[in-house]
Amino acid sequence: FEKDRALTRRFQKIDVVEPTEDETFSILKGLKSRFEEHHEVKYSAKALRAAVELSSRYINDRYLPDKAIDVIDEAGANQRLLPSSRRKKTIGVADIETIVSKIARIPPKSVSASDKDSLRTLERDLKMVVYGQDEAIDTLTSASKMSRSGLGNAQKPIGSFLFAGPTGVGKTEVTRQLALIMGIELIRFDMSEYMERHTVSRLIGAPPGYVGFDQGGLLTEAVTKHPHAVLLLDEVEKAHPDVFNLLLQVMDHGTLTDNNGRKADFRSVAIVMTTNAGASEMSRPSIGFTHQDHSTDGMEAIRKMFSPEFRNRLDAVIQFKALDPAVITRVVDKFIYELEAQLQEKGVTLDVEDSAREWLAEHGFDPKMGARPMARVIQQHIKKPLAEELLFGRLANGGHLVIRAEDDRLLHEFREEEEIS
């Protein structure tokens, strides 16, 4: 239409702008009687105001007044679907919050009882599965509680954290367990895939004229699909510097625009980045006979790696400590519980004696490498001989396995199903 100048000149352009929240509230008051008659319910004034405010804040892909009208319509329809004995006569703020949380896929504003229980025990639950990293767990849980209590910044993500420390100490595991316990999605990106400049566009989508323009960005699509999630950017120091420029906007304003101009909302997302920067400086041996603390050297390496504007937008830089001998026995127990769960499916019960636990703790402990050598020791000395027995040997039909240490090696004692009964 606008290409034909002569035709355009004969028309006057009138822009129909999106109404303000107050104007939308007036529109809803005018429509209220129609919806009340249709759904056979009443809407309180506070419910209408909540529909306007919450839809404006959390439903980003539509405009006022349409999205506010959809919310009150859906709230009424939701009551009509209930049995007559459970129907409410008046729709209140809590009903509107529930509908908006379903549409926007975020947790409801008023915290439910089950949600409260999981938040109350979140710290304890995380410390039961990740050992020796209490500071990191305390920081993460306090950010989650602050956000759910409504005291966080409404325009920013739940939290932006940089986890730094040596390999194998639980940086990724803390994040994975947080998502698992909270019952929310874990969105994980390995930043070693985004080392080149052209790969950065995969996160937000290719620009017009480039291959893949019709496909959305991996990051923006994932957050649009799961607006309440934990976003894990693993080994972020390997990413191209342009990725950090993208993250500046996300950490400050909680939104990221994709190649189609659609905004992804990060305000209900916890952003966790992990890095090994500074780990080698922290694990440097001390000079002389006295033990020296090199944790400040690790922070110096992080300052060199990340720009001041990036560090300034982080809520916290959390230094993960190397695992000590006191913690490693609990790590042994964790691996044994996992093995027990795997064997239970095969009808095999497991008994690991204290001597075997001590042997595993001694041979699987490496302060520089964390918990990963333990997994390799268990695989080499327990799982490898066990695989033969499970497939072709004495445990093919189930049974009982006792593991003990003798003469600096592990011994396996097999008892078949018939012997146990």
What positions do the PLM features span?
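AAA+ P-loop NTPase nucleotide-binding core of proteostasis motors
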Residues: 1-421
